[in-house]
């Protein structure tokens, strides 16, 4: 008789033991980075300046010297549409994670009710003043709850968590890309503005040269070939001015599209390209660990961990589930 009871209790003990275990997901192992462990040596790898700083230790505000560019980047981080969408995706992933995490715990509900009624004397058995019966009731229960014996719910919760973290890293990647694009467009606009001024000065000089040759031609000193060559130079310079004028307009439109709103004139670059492109001096040697800190790499690894957790949920689906 005792032996029969032992075998009857064995499945229950086994189920409780499984409930205390982890999940059926495989052990996650971080992939090895395909980079060299040491910094290469040779003539091409010169020593850095003593004042050079490591880029990994600097925030984006510390990289640029131009104050207008810094203010423009802050405006872009506030107004850019893609960055807003990335932030909304984070809120969505956070909500999904909270919903998935709630499945780990039972939902308990409680309800109470009271009723008091006064009866007249002719209906209360002749009691003076009537009767006042009272009724009270209370119910406590919980919604359907799955006993997570094989870690299916925990695996799904881990998957939702990793996807939420991957979304956060994707937002960081979008932010870094936005900073790089705005800085590049800013420098491109400054470069084209400098080229436009150079083209305008060249056109003015070519016109002056043409006028001089034209007077010489009228006096019979210069030949018609000299006059035509001077006229050709003027037309080439005029075409350069038109080309760079169009390029400046396109650069400004692209920059405003990145920022997300009209850019104030005081934040636009001038023709001083050297001042606009000034940056702090950075060290050339960057440790390979920086690759693991890149948001796009972090996001990819989080998605890999989410897929790893989903394997545990798929394995647990082969076993029976108990729902209370």
Question: What are the functions of these language-model segments?
Answer:
Residues 3-9, 16-78, 157, 161, ...:
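Terminal intrinsically disordered/low-complexity segments used for targeting and assembly
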Residues 27, 38, 58-59, 65-75, ...:
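Small/polar-residue-enriched beta-strand and adjacent coil segments characteristic
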Residues 53-59, 127-130, 194-199:
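A ubiquitous short alpha-helical element
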Residues 153, 169-286:
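Periplasmic alpha-helical coiled-coil/stalk elements that build and connect Gram-negative outer-membrane
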């Amino acid at each position: 008789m005792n032996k029969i009871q032992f075998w009857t209790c064995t499945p229950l003990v086994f189920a409780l033991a499984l409930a205390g275990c982890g999940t059926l997901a495989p052990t996650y192992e971080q992939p090895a980075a395909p980079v060299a462990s040491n910094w290469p040596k040779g003539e091409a790898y010169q020593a850095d300046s003593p004042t050079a700083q490591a880029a990994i230790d600097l925030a984006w505000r510390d990289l640029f010297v131009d104050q207008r560019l810094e203010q423009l980047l802050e405006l872009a981080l506030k107004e850019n549409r893609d960055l807003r969408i990335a932030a909304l995706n984070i809120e969505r992933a956070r909500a999904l994670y909270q919903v998935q995490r709630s499945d780990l715990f039972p939902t308990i509900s409680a309800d109470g009710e009271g009723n008091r009624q006064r009866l007249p004397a002719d209906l209360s058995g002749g009691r003076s003043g009537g009767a006042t019966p009272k009724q009270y009731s209370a119910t406590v229960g919980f919604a359907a709850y799955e006993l997570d014996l094989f870690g299916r719910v925990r695996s799904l919760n881990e998957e939702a968590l990793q996807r939420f973290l991957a979304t956060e890293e994707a937002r960081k990647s979008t932010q870094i890309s936005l900073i790089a694009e705005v800085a590049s467009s800013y420098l491109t606009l400054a470069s084209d503005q400098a080229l436009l001024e150079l083209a305008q000065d060249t056109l003015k000089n070519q016109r002056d040269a043409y006028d001089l040759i034209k007077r010489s031609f009228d006096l019979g000193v210069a030949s018609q070939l000299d006059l035509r060559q001077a006229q050709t130079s003027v037309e080439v310079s005029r075409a350069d001015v038109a080309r760079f004028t169009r390029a400046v307009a396109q650069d400004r439109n692209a920059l405003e599209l990145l920022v997300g709103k009209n850019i104030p004139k005081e934040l636009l670059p001038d023709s001083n390209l050297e001042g606009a492109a000034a940056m702090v001096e950075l060290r050339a040697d960057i440790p390979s660990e920086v690759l693991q800190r890149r948001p796009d790499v972090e996001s990819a690894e989080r998605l890999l961990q989410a897929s790893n957790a989903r394997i545990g949920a798929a394995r647990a689906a082969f076993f029976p589930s108990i729902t209370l």
